[in-house]
Amino acid sequence: MLQHAAIAVAICALFFVLRKWVWLYALVVFPGTLAHELSHFFVGLVLGARPASFNPFPKRAGNAIMLGEVRFERLRWWNAIPVALAPLSLVPLSAMVLHESTRAPLVSAIDIALKIVAAQFLFASKPSAKDCEHAIAGAGTLIVLAATAFVCGM
């Protein structure tokens, strides 16, 4: 089991090193980016945020690269937090894929492929700065509403 974990960590380290070469990194992590954006899309769809556009492809945004984007027509205080933090749902998915990889022979093609997928999901689970902005805005509104309810209830 320790060998499996070491290989998974090495793959994650490789992804981290690839960040120096932005376009190569964007290409390598594209499957994870697709999973990240799909998580926003489907949670937004279920919660009525009305996804208006879906773009999993990287594009230049000033001096940086935006790996993907989903825009919503009805992102509100009550659905902003779950939509913004939807990529966190990829963490348990990553763990399940990593666990499944331990059933394959060590360093076999299927073992490495599953570990790469697990690393993709793990890297893709990190909310972006924009995701955090939406989550904080939604949380701020919830805090104000809770405080108002508390004060008015006294």
Regions found by a protein language model. Name each.
Residues 19-76:
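Small-residue-rich helix-interface/hinge motifs
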